[in-house]
Amino acid sequence: MATNFDATRLAVQTAFPTNDLLFDDKEMPSIHVFIPKFRLCDVLSTQSTETHPAFIVNGKEIDGFWFGKYQSTCTDSGRAYSLPAEDPTVSHNLDWFVTQTNAKGAGWHEISNAEWAAVALWCHKHGCEPKGNNNYGKDSSETYYEAIPVPGVQDNGKTARVRTGTGPLPWSHNGRMDGIWDMNGNVWEWCIGLRLVKGELQIIPNNNAADNSVSNGASSSAWRAIKASDGSLVAPDGNGTTTGTVKLNYTGGHWEWDTTISDSKDESRGALFKNTTAASSVGDAAKLILMSLALMPDTAMTGDGIDTTYGNDNFWANNAADERCPIRGGCWFSGGGAGVFSLNLNNPRSSSWTNGGGRSAFVKLPAEA
């Protein structure tokens, strides 16, 4: 470990026991938040005691994962870092962000959709879905709270990106200083391990994508489709037409998971996440996978503090194109549609924007345990 960071690490651990300074192959630090393992029944209405997929890597359970406390700032060394009060790096495609995180060493990776979903579901269950920079420097529901703007970065004279982690406490995932910041707005965040292929949902099983030796590439053999009848994972046919697998259909002004697509369009269409449904062709096991990956609401989850509107977050998608990869969270102009359940499956992996970035994560691979 780089000894000149010892005092800093001790200070971080003392103030926030769930936070730590993690060091990469260059002995450079990032601040990450530990998310301990939990079961599906801990965050969903199900009675299933199965471990959430974010805590299973290469067939083995892990104690938890380290989620970047801040959106990624990438340096000239070709590495992505999680640090406070920085300008989040933008304007790069998915594979570029994957390269930046993978270069840090074994266990480092761009955040996976499974990991993002685990944090989002925890927030939902505990009634603390975070606010953020979704309205030009502030949250659309707030009037006075603001974060520190990135100097020289504006959108038609208004605040665009803000410095990482400089917003008020409600902008952290748990409403505390030790939480994860900016999952609502600021910049969209690329996630790995999930995609649409001509509307067919494909995943890299569990959190295997966290092992950066497993390819997240377009032609990777790790991709699997989900059998709608029983939730089993099968090799896709490559055309998005695998028989009996879960696919994304658009019906009645909302998204619906089904085994067939009656309304397929190579364009971006949006709807509220809370209105996403599953057709009768999708069995309970497959629906549980969808809910665990924050791809549809758990309508049976009710009670004090539970926001059954899921923040009125938006779900955008293109269910006809060859490959569409996920970005999560929204950006500085997404308004009330931004949030931890905001999902955009409209973009190819080659896309880049000034409002699109990433976030790093780390797991201790089971073989190293």
Where do the PLM segments sit?
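Extracellular adhesion/carbohydrate-recognition regions
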Residues: 22-107, 198-265, 269-273, 324, ...
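Amphipathic alpha-helical scaffolding segments
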Residues: 117-118, 194-198
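Short secondary-structure boundary/capping segments
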Residues: 124-129, 195, 204-207
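Charged, compositionally biased non-catalytic regions
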Residues: 1-18
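C-terminal, surface-exposed recognition/capping segments
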Residues: 1-4, 150-160, 167, 174-177, ...
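Short aromatic-cysteine micro-motif
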Residues: 50-183, 187, 256, 263, ...
